[in-house]
């Protein structure tokens, strides 16, 4: 099945502590999760790695969030939207369900 949300899509969080926040998808994981820029930040305690000259400490980084908890953001309407698929010139393309506009 084709992915409805892909890397570099702008998404909005639907549920959880970051509800309503927007960000760009950095990575889509095969486990049905996505990593979004600036969303679901967690603090990770990291050991120093002298071989790589990497200091230890508490590092803040993005954690994965379920793909069902985010929706693609439609800039034309300014709201979250659903994604559909159709064929244009023999190619499968994604489109916004609300206004039938093709996504990138």
From Swiss-Prot:
Listed SUPFAM superfamilies: Translation proteins SH3-like domain
A GO term, aspect molecular function: structural constituent of ribosome
UniProt key word Cytoplasm: no
InterPro entries attached to this UniProt entry: KOW, Rib_uL2_dom2, Ribosomal_uL24, Ribosomal_uL24_CS, Ribosomal_uL24_KOW, Translation_prot_SH3-like_sf
Disulfide-linked positions: none
Taxonomy, superkingdom: Bacteria
Entry keyword Ubl conjugation: no
Keywords per UniProt: Ribonucleoprotein, Ribosomal protein, RNA-binding, rRNA-binding
PROSITE patterns assigned to the protein according to its UniProt record, in alphabetical order: RIBOSOMAL_L24
Pfam families: KOW, ribosomal_L24
Gene Ontology BP term (one): translation
Gene Ontology, cellular component aspect: cytosol; ribonucleoprotein complex; ribosome
NCBIfam families associated with the record: rplX_bact
Function (record text): One of two assembly initiator proteins, it binds directly to the 5'-end of the 23S rRNA, where it nucleates assembly of the 50S subunit. One of the proteins that surrounds the polypeptide exit tunnel on the outside of the subunit.
Subunit (UniProt): Part of the 50S ribosomal subunit.
Family: Belongs to the universal ribosomal protein uL24 family.
Protein's name according to its UniProt entry: Large ribosomal subunit protein uL24
